[in-house]
Design a protein with these regions (language model features):
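Conserved pre-motif I regulatory segment
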Residues: 15-56
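Non-transmembrane alpha-helical segments in soluble domains
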Residues: 9, 44-48, 96, 100
Length: 247
C-alpha cells in the first residue's frame, strides 16, 4: 500500500510554474501604430501580477517596450504611483525617445548629466519627489548617487553582521576550515567598522534619500551590471557564488 501511495505521488503530485497571459490587457494610451507581440504582453502580465520579475529574453525581444508598457499599466491600475527606470548612462535619451514613441502622451522626466552634478542633484531629486510623472529615467551611475536612509543602512548592516556571527558559530561547532572562519571574521569586522562610521557621521539634512523620492516601482535595464555584489555565504570556491567582500 505504501508503495502504491509513493507511485501515485510520483505520477500525479507535481509543481508547475505559473504562466501569465497578457492577451486581455488593453494598454490604454499606447500608440495604435505599435502592437506588442504575445510574448511581450505575457511579460507585462508577469510584471504586473508576479511581483519581482526578471526579463531573461534574448536581444531584440522587445524588453524595453515590455518595461515601458508594464509601468504605464501599473500606474493606470493603481499598482504604482511613481515608476523609476534605471538604465545604462548612454541610453537615457534613447529610453526617453522610446517611451514617447510607445506612449506619445506620457509625462516623462529624463535625467541629464547636469541634473546630477553636486549643485543640481538636490533640486532634481526634489522634482522627482514632488512631480507627478508617468516615468522617471536616470542612468546607472546617477542612481548610485542617491543614498538610502541612514536608518535603512544601519538595519541592513546589523542584519548582515548577525548572519555572519551565526555562521561563524556554526562553522566553529562543525569544526569548519580555519581559513574560512578567518575570512568570515574579517568580513564581520569590516561590516562593524562600516556601521560605526555610519553612526558617527552626522546626518546631512540637505541630502534627499531614495525613500523620500516616493518611488514604488523600480525597473532596472541591463541588471547584470549589479550581479555578484556582496552576499554572505559559508560556501566558497563554488561556481556562481560571489566572492566579493563587503565594501
Amino acid at each position: 500500500a505504501a508503495s502504491d501511495v509513493y507511485k501515485r505521488q510520483e505520477l500525479f503530485n507535481s509543481s508547475r510554474p505559473r504562466e501569465y497571459d497578457g492577451s486581455h490587457i488593453q494598454f490604454t494610451g499606447m500608440t495604435p501604430e505599435i502592437t506588442l507581440m504575445p510574448h511581450q504582453k505575457n511579460a507585462v502580465a508577469h510584471i504586473l501580477y508576479g511581483n519581482n520579475t526578471l526579463l531573461a529574453h534574448c536581444v531584440g525581444a522587445g524588453k524595453t517596450f515590455q518595461m515601458i508598457a508594464a509601468g504605464m499599466e501599473s500606474r493606470r491600475l493603481g499598482l504604482s504611483q511613481k515608476n523609476l527606470y534605471v538604465v545604462p548612462n548612454h541610453l537615457t535619451e534613447q529610453w526617453g525617445s522610446d517611451f514617447l514613441r510607445l506612449y506619445p502622451g506620457a509625462n516623462v522626466l529624463v535625467a541629464t548629466k547636469k541634473d546630477f552634478e553636486p549643485a543640481n542633484r538636490k533640486k532634481f531629486c526634489s522634482r522627482i519627489a514632488t512631480g507627478d510623472y508617468d516615468a522617471i529615467i536616470i542612468g546607472h551611475s546617477q542612481f548610485e548617487k542617491i543614498p538610502i536612509s541612514q536608518e535603512r543602512q544601519e538595519r541592513l548592516l546589523r542584519e548582515q553582521i548577525d548572519e555572519i556571527a551565526v555562521g561563524i558559530e556554526e562553522m566553529e561547532r562543525e569544526n569548519g576550515e580555519r581559513f574560512t572562519i578567518k575570512r568570515m571574521e574579517a568580513t564581520r569586522k569590516s561590516l562593524e567598522a562600516r556601521l560605526e562610521k555610519l553612526k558617527a557621521d552626522e546626518k546631512k539634512d540637505d541630502v534627499v534619500t531614495f525613500e523620500e523620492l516616493g518611488v514604488d516601482r523600480l525597473f532596472i535595464d541591463e541588471s547584470h551590471y549589479y550581479k555578484n555584489l556582496f552576499l554572505f555565504t559559508k560556501m566558497r570556491n563554488v561556481g556562481g557564488i560571489a566572492q566579493t567582500e563587503a565594501m
